[in-house]
C-alpha cells in the first residue's frame, strides 16, 4: 500500500493547525462568529503559504462542516465555458448546506472571457453563493475583479515557523522515540531552502527521509541535488590562490563523474553570492547556506577582498558558457587565463 505523503498527512484541518498568518485567521474567524461573510474573497501570496488550505478551512467553518466546497483548478479549467458551468451551478441553491462555496485555485490562469463571465456573477451573486479565489500572481487579476472581492495577502512563513512545524512532524512520526539521527541544523536548512513555503519544506523533508531515515545535512544536500559544498570551497580557494591546476582538476572530476559542468558553474555562482552576503552581514539568517558551514565561512572571510575578484570571474564565465556547446573547454581556458593574471 502506498504511503500517504507527509504534506497530505499533515495538511492543517483547522486554523489552529496552521503556522503563522495570524491576522488573516483572526479576521476570518471573526467573520464566522458574526456571520458577516463576503460574496467574493481573494487569497494571494507565495506558493505553500496556506491560501488553498485556508480557503478549505474557511469554507468548512462557514457551513459548520456540512457539505463540501466546489473546487476548480483554473490552470486546467481556464476557459469561459468552464466558468459558465460554475455560474450555472451557483444559481442553484445548495441542498446539504447553507452556503454554496466555490474555491477557484490558480485563478490568474483564467482567460479574459472567463473573467468577464465571472464578473457579473460577483456583482449580482446569490445570497447563498461565496467565491474564494486563490493566486500566486495577483498582478494578473483584472482591476474590475479586485474591486469586488475582499483581498488577503499571505506572507512567507518564517524559517523558525517552518522549523518548528518540521520538528513537530518528526516527533509525531516517532523519530524522537527511536535511535534515528535528527539533526536540527538539517531541519533549519530545509526551512531556508523552502523559501517561506511550508508545503515545499514538508515535501523536501519527506524526500530526504525516503533517501535515509537519518536526517543529516549531507543527505539533505544529496536530496536536493546541490553539489557538495566542500567542492565549492575547494574551487573558491583554487581561484583565490590563482591555482589553475587544482581548479582544472575539479572541473575534470565534475565532468568525468557525468555531471553537467555548466550547471556546476551556475550553482557555484550562487554559492559565491551566499559567501559574499555572509562576509557583509556575518549572519546566517541572511543566507541559504547551512549553519554547519560557519567555521569554513569564517576562514573564507579572511580573504574577503579576493572573493570580489573571484565573483567577477565567475559571473563572466557563466555568461560565456550560457550558449556554448563545449562549456568545459571554455571554463578551463578562462580559468587558466584568470590564474595567470
Regions found by a protein language model. Give the residues of each.
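P-loop/Walker A NTP-binding region and its immediately flanking N-terminal helices
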Residues: 1-163, 167-171, 184, 252-253
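Extended, largely alpha-helical regulatory/partner-binding modules appended to the mid-to-C-terminal parts
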Residues: 49, 55, 82, 134, ...
Amino acid at each position: 500500500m502506498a504511503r500517504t505523503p507527509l504534506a497530505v498527512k499533515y495538511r492543517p484541518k483547522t486554523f489552529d493547525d496552521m503556522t503563522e498568518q495570524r491576522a488573516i485567521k483572526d479576521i476570518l474567524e471573526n467573520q464566522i462568529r458574526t456571520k458577516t461573510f463576503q460574496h467574493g474573497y481573494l487569497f494571494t501570496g507565495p506558493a505553500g503559504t496556506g491560501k488553498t488550505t485556508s480557503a478549505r478551512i474557511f469554507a468548512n467553518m462557514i457551513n459548520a462542516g456540512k457539505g463540501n466546497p466546489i473546487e476548480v483548478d483554473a490552470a486546467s479549467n481556464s476557459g469561459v465555458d468552464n466558468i459558465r458551468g460554475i455560474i450555472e451551478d451557483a444559481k442553484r441553491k445548495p441542498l446539504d448546506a447553507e452556503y454554496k462555496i466555490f474555491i477557484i485555485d490558480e485563478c490568474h490562469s483564467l482567460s479574459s472571457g472567463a473573467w468577464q463571465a465571472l464578473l457579473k456573477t460577483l456583482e449580482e451573486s446569490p445570497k447563498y453563493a461565496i467565491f474564494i479565489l486563490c493566486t500566486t500572481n495577483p498582478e494578473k487579476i483584472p482591476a474590475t475583479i479586485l474591486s469586488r472581492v475582499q483581498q488577503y495577502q499571505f506572507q512567507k512563513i518564517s524559517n523558525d515557523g517552518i522549523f518548528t512545524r518540521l520538528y513537530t512532524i518528526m516527533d509525531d512520526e516517532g523519530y524522537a522515540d527511536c535511535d534515528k539521527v535528527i539533526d536540527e541544523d538539517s531541519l533549519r536548512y530545509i526551512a531556508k531552502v523552502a523559501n517561506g513555503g511550508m508545503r515545499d519544506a514538508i515535501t523536501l523533508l519527506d524526500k530526504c527521509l525516503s533517501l535515509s531515515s537519518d536526517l543529516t545535512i549531507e543527505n539533505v544536500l544529496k536530496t536536493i541535488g546541490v553539489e557538495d559544498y566542500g567542492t565549492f570551497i575547494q574551487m573558491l580557494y583554487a581561484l583565490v590562490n590563482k591555482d589553475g591546476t587544482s581548479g582544472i582538476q575539479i572541473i575534470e572530476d565534475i565532468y568525468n563523474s557525468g555531471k553537467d559542468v555548466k550547471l556546476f558553474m551556475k550553482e557555484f555562482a550562487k554559492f559565491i553570492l551566499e559567501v559574499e552576503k555572509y562576509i557583509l552581514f556575518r549572519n546566517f539568517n541572511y543566507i541559504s547556506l547551512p549553519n554547519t558551514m560557519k567555521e569554513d565561512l569564517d576562514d573564507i572571510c579572511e580573504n574577503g577582498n579576493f572573493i570580489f575578484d573571484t565573483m567577477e570571474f565567475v559571473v563572466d564565465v557563466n555568461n560565456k558558457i550560457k550558449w556554448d556547446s563545449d562549456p568545459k573547454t571554455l571554463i578551463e581556458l578562462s580559468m587558466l587565463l584568470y590564474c595567470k593574471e
